[in-house]
Amino acid sequence: MKQIAILGSTGSIGVSTLEIVAAHPDKFRVLSLSGAKNLDLLARQIRQFRPRLAAVADPADIPRLKELLSGVEVELTGGVEGLCAAATAPGVQMVVAAIVGAAGLVPTAAAIRAGIDVALANKETLVTAGHLFMELVERHKVKLYPVDSEHSAIFQSIEGHRSQDITKIILTASGGPFRETPLEKLQSVTIQDALNHPNWSMGRKITIDSATMMNKGLEVIEARWLFDAPAEKISVNIHPQSIIHSMVEYIDGCVIAQLGTPDMKAPIAYALSYPERVSTGVKPLDLTELSGLTFSKPDLERFPCLGLAYRALGEGESMPAVMNAANEVAVEAFLDGRISYLQIAALIEKTMDAHQAHRLGSIEEVLEADRWGRATARDICNTLQTGRCL
């Protein structure tokens, strides 16, 4: 039985992970959980899965959580130290790192330093500090399993093959809700329009990232570190059906792809159970029901955020951390109705233009770059003329 910790258990990845755990009580046991503000859901999860320890992002929420858990024996903690305690709880064999944003960096690093394998769903870990985390992974001899459907697909497609035989990694993207929207109409996109993803059910932030294709840009940067591939070997194809989750091209001209019904439980289960496979409840793919699989190159005029991610990867050093921070500020501002959809990319670009990339030698320096990026993006956001679209 594999004993796991789930950081970010109240988010969409965390909830899906617990569904896998509940379906396989003979294979997985939850030793610790962490959540942010959804205390009611966290309390229900604690009652159902009975972890030894649970952490909340804000220690001030501990008294309220205690009230919700009357009669339940569980150690409660909070803050960064609490998240690290959840990640390194005695007996934990795998950490599911699903905290959204830079808040996931320190506890994920703590797990790696403790020699614990990580199922990685937190994009920011590799986007902002890829070189540092891969050095930690190598130094502490732990395994890093991708949870993103695209990176899981690549991981499965390179099994048994030599890295030097790979000529290209091809990430697929649905294109989101605005794949065919006339460019002139993007100015009037509403929040609800952007949250209406055609294929995937995800959290609000990642759904907006999917609409702008920043999500795919972050995945390009992740792939660079996960698979030790230079930017020129990583490309993106628009694939509206979201059936092929990613592909790998080899020197002999062959392309290996992973196909499946769009459901995050499949890559989560593979990360948890590797090298075995377990049932997930995901509907099997029936190829005879498909009308076709189509592909196209992304239009960077329509999706400027993808181009900004490639730019950040090319400049390297601190630029990806600053870009990521600016994106989080921009998405939050859009969801609050303070800027328009098109101003998301504009805000990120202005923040990047104001930054001089420099080397990051520690996680604290990464967090400092993140803080600089957020502060600068907020200042720039205040100067933008609002395009409020509710």
Curated annotation (Swiss-Prot):
Which residues are 1-deoxy-D-xylulose 5-phosphate-binding? 123, 149-150, 174, 197, 210, 215-216, 219
Name the positions where Mn(2+) binds. 148, 150, 219
Keywords of the record: Isoprene biosynthesis, Manganese, Metal-binding, NADP, Oxidoreductase
Q: If you read the UniProt record, what top EC class would you report for this enzyme, in one word?
A: oxidoreductase
Enzymatic reactions = 2-C-methyl-D-erythritol 4-phosphate + NADP(+) = 1-deoxy-D-xylulose 5-phosphate + NADPH + H(+)
Reading the lineage from the top rank, the first entry is Bacteria
This protein's pathway: Isoprenoid biosynthesis; isopentenyl diphosphate biosynthesis via DXP pathway; isopentenyl diphosphate from 1-deoxy-D-xylulose 5-phosphate: step 1/6
KW Secreted (keyword) present? no
GO process annotations (BP) = isopentenyl diphosphate biosynthetic process, methylerythritol 4-phosphate pathway involved in terpenoid biosynthetic process
Q: Where does NADPH bind?
A: 10-13, 36-38, 122, 124, 203
Q: Name one Pfam family in it.
A: DXP_redisom_C
InterPro entries recorded for this chain? Answer: DXP_reductoisomerase, DXP_reductoisomerase_C, DXP_reductoisomerase_N, DXPR_C, DXPR_C_sf, NAD(P)-bd_dom_sf
The catalytic activity of this protein is classed by the Enzyme Commission as 1.1.1.267
Q: Give one GO molecular function term.
A: manganese ion binding
| Cofactor section | Mg(2+); Mn(2+)
Q: What does this protein do?
A: Catalyzes the NADPH-dependent rearrangement and reduction of 1-deoxy-D-xylulose-5-phosphate (DXP) to 2-C-methyl-D-erythritol 4-phosphate (MEP).
Q: Which family does it belong to?
A: Belongs to the DXR family.
Record PANTHER family: 1-DEOXY-D-XYLULOSE 5-PHOSPHATE REDUCTOISOMERASE (PTHR30525), 1-DEOXY-D-XYLULOSE 5-PHOSPHATE REDUCTOISOMERASE, CHLOROPLASTIC (PTHR30525:SF0)
Q: What is this protein called?
A: 1-deoxy-D-xylulose 5-phosphate reductoisomerase
Q: Which organism is it from?
A: Trichlorobacter lovleyi (strain ATCC BAA-1151 / DSM 17278 / SZ) (Geobacter lovleyi)
Gene label: dxr
